Regions:
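Short glycine-/aliphatic-rich beta-strand segments at the starts of folded cytosolic domains
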Residues: 1-17
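Short, surface-exposed acidic/glycine-rich loop or hinge patches that mediate macromolecular interfaces
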Residues: 13, 23, 50-51, 238, ...
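Short amphipathic alpha-helix segments
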Residues: 13-31
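Hydrophobic side chains in well-ordered alpha-helices
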Residues: 18, 25, 55-59, 244-247
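A short, structured beta-strand/loop element
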Residues: 31-38
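Interdomain "pre-motor" coupling segment immediately N-terminal to P-loop NTPase/helicase cores
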Residues: 38-97
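Conserved loop-to-helix interface motifs that mediate assembly, gating, or partner/ligand docking
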Residues: 86-108, 112-115
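Conserved helicase motor core of SF1/SF2 NTP-dependent helicases
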Residues: 105-117, 122-233, 237-343
Length: 343
C-alpha cells in the first residue's frame, strides 16, 4: 500500500502541550493510527496510509485547537480524539470545548469532554428530569453538580439539594458507630468534595448555614415538596422502586432533577429490584424526562479505568447472553414430548 504525507503547521510553543512529555502523546497517535510523525520546529509531517494520515491529521488539528484555547492537553483528550477519528467525528470535537458549564473556585473551566457528556449537559438544560446512567468515571455526578451550581449562581433556582441512598458496600447504618450525622457523612463525602472544589469551602459553608445547600440521605426527602430547587439523586441504583417513586413525587414547581446511577455497582440485597432499573422502563415515554446512557467511551479518568470498565461491560454482556441461552435450552427441553428413551 502506497504511503502519503500530510504537512501541518503547529507553532513551537504548542508542541510540548500537544505531543506530551517525552512525546508520549505523539507515540500513542503513531501506534494506534499506524502513522509516523516527524516534527521539525513548527512543521509536523504525518506519513502513512491515506486513511490513517487523514485520521491523524484530524486528531492533531483538534489538539492544536484545544491548545490555542488555553487547554492543558491530557491523555484522555488524545485517546478520545483517536477513537472519534475512526467514526469521522474528530472535526466536530472542538464544538464540545466551546461549552463551559461553570468555573471552579480556582478558575478552571468545567466542560463536557465527550459527545455523551455534551448530550447529558444539553439534556439537563432542556428537560425537567434527567437520568444519567453509566459507569464510574463518566462525569455523571460532577457535571450535574456543576450545572446545579451554575443554575444557583444565575438565580434560576433558590437552593441545591443533593441526596444519596445510605446503602453501600453491604454496610447498614445501624451497625456503624456514632450519631446519625457521623454515620451518613461517609456516604455523602463525594458530594461534599465536588462542592468544595467547585464553590470553595467558604462559599459552600456559608450557603449550608443559610440552608441554601442541603446534603442529606434520601430518607430525609419523604413528606416534602421541593419547589425552586436543583435536586440531584446520586447512586440511584441503590434505591428501591418505592424510594424512587417517593423521590420523584417530591418535585415541585420551578425545580430541576438529575438522577445518576450505575447499574453495575448495585449494593441492594440480591433479590431486590433497583428503583433506577424500574424507572427507566416506567418513565421512558414521558416527554419531559430524558434518559442519557453514558458508556466506557465517556470515561474521563485514567486510561486504565476505561479498559477496566470495558472489560466488565463485555463480561456482563457475555453473562447475559449465556443466561438467555440457558433459558432457551431449558424451555425447549420442557416443551419436548418425552419418549421411551427419556429418564
Amino acid at each position: 500500500m502506497s504511503e502519503v504525507e500530510s504537512l501541518i503547521n503547529i507553532p513551537v510553543e504548542h508542541c510540548s502541550n500537544i505531543f506530551g512529555q517525552f512525546d508520549e502523546y505523539a507515540k500513542v497517535i503513531e501506534k494506534t493510527l499506524k502513522v509516523t510523525i516527524i516534527v521539525r520546529d513548527s512543521s509536523v509531517k504525518v506519513i502513512g496510509a491515506e486513511a490513517a494520515v487523514q485520521r491523524a491529521s484530524g486528531v492533531l488539528n483538534y489538539l492544536y485547537e484545544l491548545s490555542k484555547r488555553g487547554n492543558q492537553i491530557t491523555r484522555q483528550n488524545v485517546d478520545y480524539s483517536i477513537a472519534q477519528s475512526f467514526e469521522e467525528k474528530a472535526d466536530s470535537l472542538i464544538e464540545i470545548d466551546s461549552d463551559t458549564v461553570c468555573r471552579t473556585i480556582a478558575g478552571r473551566p468545567i466542560k463536557p469532554k465527550t459527545f455523551g457528556q455534551k448530550e447529558y449537559v444539553d439534556a439537563i438544560r432542556d428537560k425537567m428530569i434527567v437520568f444519567g446512567v453509566g459507569p464510574a468515571g463518566t462525569g455523571k455526578t460532577y457535571l450535574a453538580m456543576a450545572m446545579a451550581i451554575n443554575a444557583f449562581k444565575n438565580n434560576e433556582v433558590n437552593k441545591i439539594i443533593l441526596t444519596r441512598p445510605a446503602i453501600e458496600a453491604g454496610e447498614k447504618l445501624g451497625l456503624l458507630p456514632g450519631d446519625l450525622q457521623s454515620k451518613v457523612d461517609p456516604y455523602l463525602r463525594p458530594l461534599y468534595d465536588a462542592l468544595f472544589q467547585i464553590m470553595g469551602a467558604e462559599s459552600f459553608n456559608a450557603n449550608m448555614e443559610k440552608g441554601l445547600i442541603e446534603v442529606a440521605p434520601l430518607a430525609y426527602m419523604r413528606g416534602r415538596t421541593l419547589d425552586n430547587a436543583f435536586i440531584i439523586l446520586d447512586e440511584a441504583q441503590n434505591t428501591t422502586p418505592a424510594q424512587m417513586k417517593m423521590f420523584l413525587t417530591r418535585i415541585g414547581f420551578g425545580s430541576k432533577v438529575v438522577v445518576t446511577g450505575d447499574m453495575t455497582q448495585k449494593d441492594l440485597p440480591r433479590d431486590t429490584v433497583s428503583g433506577l432499573e424500574v424507572a427507566t422502563k416506567v418513565l421512558s415515554k414521558v416527554e419531559e424526562i430524558a434518559f442519557i446512557k453514558l458508556t466506557n467511551k465517556d470515561v474521563v479518568r485514567h486510561p486504565l479505568v476505561q479498559k477496566i470498565v470495558k472489560a466488565y461491560e463485555d463480561y456482563e454482556e457475555n453473562q447475559a447472553k449465556a443466561a438467555k441461552r440457558r433459558e432457551a435450552r431449558k424451555g425447549s427441553q420442557t416443551g419436548r414430548r418425552k419418549n421411551r428413551y427419556d429418564y
